[in-house]
Amino acid sequence: MALIIQKFGGTSVANIERIKKLVPIIKAEITKNNQVIVVVSAMAGVTNQLVTLCSEVSSLNKISQFAEYDVALSSGEIVTAALLALALQEEEIQAQSLLAWQLPILTNNNHSKALVEFITTDLLEKCLQLKIIPIIAGFQGINKSNRITTFGRGGSDTTAALIAAAMKADRCDIYTDVDGIFTADPRIIPNAKRIKEIDFLEMLELASSGAKVLHPRAVELVMRYKIDMRVLSTFLPNTEGTLITSKDTTPLVKSTYMDMEESAKNIKRSTKINIPDDTSGLTYKLPIELALQNRYNMENCIIRGITSNKNLLKVSVNTITLSFLQVANMITYNNNCIEFMQEIKNNIEYNFITNLTDKNNLQTLLTNCKNNKQIQNFTFDTEIATISLIGYGIKNDCKLLEMILSQLTQDNINVNMMQLSEVKITLLINDKDVEKTISNLYNLFKIS
């Protein structure tokens, strides 16, 4: 018996007819003797309507206003969860809609872009024991002040990934309007091929680069907790879709959710909280103050390591006739590798970071360009280095960047360039500051 999380997006629940068509998809998984937990989005277009309504009555420039904004936006998923539960019940399948406060899904206080700290799974486990299918309203959580929070766009994908991690699910299936991940957008490239299987990191790059099938936050979470994810079509339920997986099944964060889950069970045992055996007990939740006795965070930013590279060359070019792309093409022509590209002044000055070993080659190349009056001047700077912090949840955690910049300001470190992704932040600094920066950031984040 496997535990499958099924998430249905906005187009999959766009109207009553489509909601009814989800019943056989869910039932098919049950007939395989699998347990199922469902996460739903709002019906297509509903969230946009709610955003418009909020903007018509509020400027949304106060924290208190964003708290109410979250309440309004969360209603879309709540309606969908109830409608799908009704559709399943109509077919004699036991189902119950569940909201964030009922589990609870505990978050920080960042309204409209909350990060999840802890999910209490007792209620979900009880539903599964009683063969009741939980239908969870996605996109939302609850903070320690008992206020509704939302996760931002793509939040239902995030809910599904988090529930999969909390429940140690065997797989998380994302149902949408396309039958998998393609080599390019099929609307632009009609002969684009569906990818049968893709690695977590490759999928994270695609999602971060604009592929809208999955939200990068959800991909980062299943990669972090090593949970297989499938992208499937609601409208072509018999297709294979795309499997997002890794051959290594060891969770990348061994001591976060696994440890906090056991701690929560100890809290529950020590406070003698009982879960009733009948279905009326499905309003049970672990008190928030107990769950937060230890500071848990399922989406906490984890820094796994810090690296540096001094083997770099900064090239500054003042052009006369060459465009940005022409200069970049010229530099890469003889196998010179560009790591950073930056336009300083429109069509006038550009900066490139490349390998220090390319200096002599570039000296000859750019001198010829200057003699041919293609560029006005160029300079080299060898006193540069990069510092990279590698981990998880980096782009989602606003406090991370704040902590780094505060530390660098305190240390009088000048940052020339910066790049962020879901799994890495890279800073370009003076090479004389490398050791000091590494030491202080290492201690700041207690990397071990």
Curated annotation (Swiss-Prot):
Q: Which GO terms describe its molecular function?
A: aspartate kinase activity; ATP binding
Pathway(s): Amino-acid biosynthesis; L-lysine biosynthesis via DAP pathway; (S)-tetrahydrodipicolinate from L-aspartate: step 1/4; Amino-acid biosynthesis; L-methionine biosynthesis via de novo pathway; L-homoserine from L-aspartate: step 1/3; Amino-acid biosynthesis; L-threonine biosynthesis; L-threonine from L-aspartate: step 1/5
Pfam family example for this protein?
Answer: ACT_9
Sorted alphabetically, the keyword list is: Amino-acid biosynthesis, ATP-binding, Diaminopimelate biosynthesis, Kinase, Lysine biosynthesis, Nucleotide-binding, Transferase
Name its GO BP terms in alphabetical order. Answer: diaminopimelate biosynthetic process; homoserine biosynthetic process; lysine biosynthetic process via diaminopimelate; threonine biosynthetic process
Leader sequence range is none
Reaction equations catalysed: L-aspartate + ATP = 4-phospho-L-aspartate + ADP
Amino-acid biosynthesis among the record's keywords? yes
Q: What is its EC number?
A: 2.7.2.4
GO CC list: cytosol
- RPE1 insert domain location: 250-296
> Hey, which family's this protein in?
Belongs to the aspartokinase family.
Task: Tell me what this protein is called.
Answer: Aspartokinase
User: Which organism is this entry from?
Assistant: Rickettsia typhi (strain ATCC VR-144 / Wilmington)
